[in-house]
Amino acid sequence: MEWQEFDRGVFLVNLLGIVYNPETKMILIGKRENNPYLKELSWSFPGGRPAYKNELEDYLKIEIKKKTNLDVSIEKIIFAKTYPENREFLSIYYLCKVESGEEKVGEKFTEIKWVKPTNVQKYFTTSLHKNLLDYLKTLE
């Protein structure tokens, strides 16, 4: 059965890590190109679509490591949302803390950078929910 046949309750889930450095009060974002699900996407938080074989948090740690070379701990779920650009796409945002590693560009990113949480919106070309933006302000 094709997932498009369901009229509700089926989403393409994406896990995203707000990788935060409490010492510098900065978060890590990555630049992507050619995202097949959100054509407008440029900068994003590291993460990806989970496989069925892993716990969500374990999968997110693996994806962040592949994309940034950083080992992180998962602190908590921050927020979940769908997008006006594609309502079938559900993102779950987690607060993550760097445990070890030196950041470097990895899988699917062409660039990574640390930014002030209140500057994230300057980079993103997709919508960021007001509740997420309000939360990011608390990190500064």
What spans do the regions from the language model cover?
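A structural signal for short, well-ordered beta-strand segments
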Residues: 17, 77, 94-96
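Conserved Nudix-box catalytic region and its N-terminal flanking loop in Nudix hydrolases
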Residues: 26-66
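Active-site-adjacent beta-strand/loop module that shapes the phosphate/pyrophosphate-binding cleft
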Residues: 81-102, 135
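NUDIX/MutT-family hydrolases
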Residues: 104-135
